[in-house]
Amino acid sequence: MQGLMQAHPLMISSMLEHARRYHPDTEIVSKTCEQTIVRSNYRTLSHRAKQMAQTLIAMGVKPGDRVATLAWNTHRHLELYFAVSGIGAVLHTVNPRLFPEQIEYILNHAESGVLFFDITFASLVEDLTPALPHVRRFIAMTDADHMAGMPAQAEPYEDLIAQQDGNYDWPVFDENAASSLCYTSGTTGNPKGVLYSHRSTYLHSLLVCQVDGLQLSSADSTLLAV
């Protein structure tokens, strides 16, 4: 006999839905690489994450596919955290402080098919492109007005997201499915990949809210340094 109380998978997307439902107007502040301060909220984050989820599906991204980011802490990167994992794909966050040779190795080893990058990494991406056979789409995390100097094959993030209406329901699947992928700095040998699941990320998020954790609540304002 199995219990039926709260018998649902621990999905990352459900955390965003909780925030949208109960804290829709709570402010989220970030700064873009274009030096613009962006003030958003959980309602807008949810809508744009769903638009990006639709964008990824339109690109042909499927569950289990790796989607890489080479980016700083911005509102667009946050949207990707939820959008990529939300459709069952794996967000592959690449450490921009690694050597170019290590970044090349990591992207190829993970076989990431899409690369989202901040405009500060345009020249790095251009130099690496010939050595990245698995990457089929390059997305500059900016708008059309800031595409000067971007690699020729790059597409502006905002143009892609604007093509979708955000009318999307997050799928429910195995909570043990991979949600994100990080690589070590390669202290010995090449960097090693570490896979996180929806379940592990969900439980970690709950733990930081506990009294013996960071004791965070909806009453707190936090500055995240990732």
Regions found by a protein language model. Give the residues of each.
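A short N-terminal helical cap/helix-turn-helix that marks the beginning
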Residues: 7-29, 47
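A broad, structural micro-motif
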Residues: 39-40, 98, 155, 173, ...
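Short hydrophobic alpha-helical segments of the AMP-binding
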Residues: 77-85, 91, 201, 208
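Conserved AMP-binding/adenylate-forming core of the ANL superfamily
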Residues: 28-74, 78-82, 99-104, 156-159
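Structural core segment of the AMP-binding/adenylate-forming
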Residues: 15-17, 58-59, 86-162, 173
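Conserved adenylate-forming
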Residues: 56-61, 167-177, 181-225
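Conserved AMP-binding
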Residues: 71-74, 95, 216, 222-226
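Conserved G/P- and acidic residue-centered "switch" motifs that form tight phosphate/ATP-binding loops
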Residues: 67, 88, 187
